[in-house]
Design a protein with these regions (language model features):
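Hydrophobic alpha-helical transmembrane segments of multi-pass integral membrane proteins
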Residues: 1-378
Length: 378
């Protein structure tokens, strides 16, 4: 589908507050729905950012300027690539939750332009000024939060406000990260806060969509061995996970972090088992959602091991960033892109290869600690 196509609108609305919703009357089809520019932009930026980071590690280029190369890499994975995919998901999911038409057209163009500006400015912080680059980038998540909050409130879907709490935490973490980078430091607390916020979103939203999609798939084939419906156990698992992540964010080396992380690992492993993911093996688009969620209990175990000085803290971050965040985002991107463009929900060979490669990356990085001689190759 070409980006130069135009899309007519039926019943485009402009509610109080001035945010037009619905498909644009004319203009590029890429700005007709939030997932189109942000999924594409996020995917392309993930590739570009990793190529630049590898080139910097190899000594071919200088990266980040006064912002710092390690800061740039951490930031662009957490707040560059990941925030784009999160934006694409929320701008697609929130209309489904609220029953309102999606934000599109010029507001979507401006929001995407703001995200792009953040990427460009942080590539040349010495040229535009580190403070200017950080300020421009720091505006994106609050802008996304404002749009999503307005839609949820206008739709009176109060139960969905909890999702916006994670987005608020990300906005704060981004600002704290920038402040630390400007001072020449890498804010580990801000990094853990951001990772925790994304993980909480996966716990909440994943707990909503994974069993639902699984149930629908089983029902289509006349199966009755459905996932266990949401009940008090799920609430306990969510609260336990939040407590463990909060402890890890503030006191990552404490014994309390070990205890809460191991308890959360058990609760979320049991939660995953209750969803009966093994029954979905023939459907790769669905089974990868279960695989992504499986990295949550794995991540909690990694937190405990790191607190006991058995595993490096950077490996913990990679279990969450690549395993939980990366795999879940890839799973959601492929499913939403297929579903919202009217195509069959089936993974191509290339898509399956991407699933396998990302899962392998999430496993190999912590495994490399036990084979230090092969660290760079792995």
């Amino acid at each position: 589908m070409s980006g130069s196509q135009t899309v007519p609108t039926q019943g485009r609305s402009r509610p109080k507050g001035g945010i037009p919703r619905g498909l644009a009357r004319s203009g590029p089809v890429i700005f007709s729905y939030g997932f189109r520019p942000f999924f594409l932009g996020g995917a392309l930026w993930a590739i570009v950012a990793m190529v630049l980071w590898i080139a910097a590690l190899s000594g071919f280029i200088d990266l980040g300027g006064d912002y710092g190369a390690p800061n740039w890499h951490a930031h662009e994975m957490l707040f560059g690539f990941a925030s784009a995919v999160l934006a694409g998901f929320l701008l697609t999911a929130v209309p489904n939750w609220t029953g309102r038409l999606p934000v599109s057209g010029k507001p979507l163009v401006w929001l995407f332009a703001l995200w792009c500006a953040g990427r460009i400015f942080l590539l040349v912080p010495d040229t535009v000024g580190v403070v200017t680059a950080a300020t421009v980038d720091g505006l994106f998540l609050p802008a996304l939060l404002t749009i999503c909050a307005r839609e949820v409130i206008a739709g009176r879907k109060w139960k969905d406000l909890k999702v916006l709490g994670g987005l608020l935490a990300l906005s704060v973490a981004n600002i704290v990260f920038h402040l630390a980078a400007i001072e020449g430091d890498l804010s580990q607390t801000a990094t853990r806060l951001a990772v925790s916020a994304y993980t909480v979103l996966v716990i909440i939203v994943g707990g909503r969509i994974v069993p639902s999609f699984t149930r629908n798939w089983l029902n289509r084939f006349g199966r009755t061995d459905f996932p266990v419906p949401y009940n008090g156990f799920d609430t306990a698992a969510i609260l336990t996970g939040i407590a463990a992540l909060a402890t890890w964010t503030m006191e990552p080396e404490s014994m309390l972090a070990v205890i809460t992380a191991l308890l959360a690992a058990f609760m979320h492993a049991m939660r995953l088992i209750r969803w009966r993911g093994w029954t979905t093996w023939p459907d790769q688009v669905l089974v990868v959602l279960h695989a992504a969620y499986a990295f949550i209990p794995a991540g909690f175990i990694a937190i405990a091991l790191a607190a006991l000085d058995v595993m490096d803290t950077r490996s913990v971050l990679h279990v969450f960033t690549v395993g939980v965040i990366g795999c879940m985002m890839l799973a959601v991107m492929t499913r939403a892109s297929l579903g919202h463009t009217g195509r069959k929900l089936a993974a191509s060979k290339v898509t399956i290869a991407a699933y396998v490669a990302l899962i392998a990356c999430a496993l190999l990085r912590p495994a490399a600690e036990f084979f230090p001689g092969a660290m760079m190759r792995l």
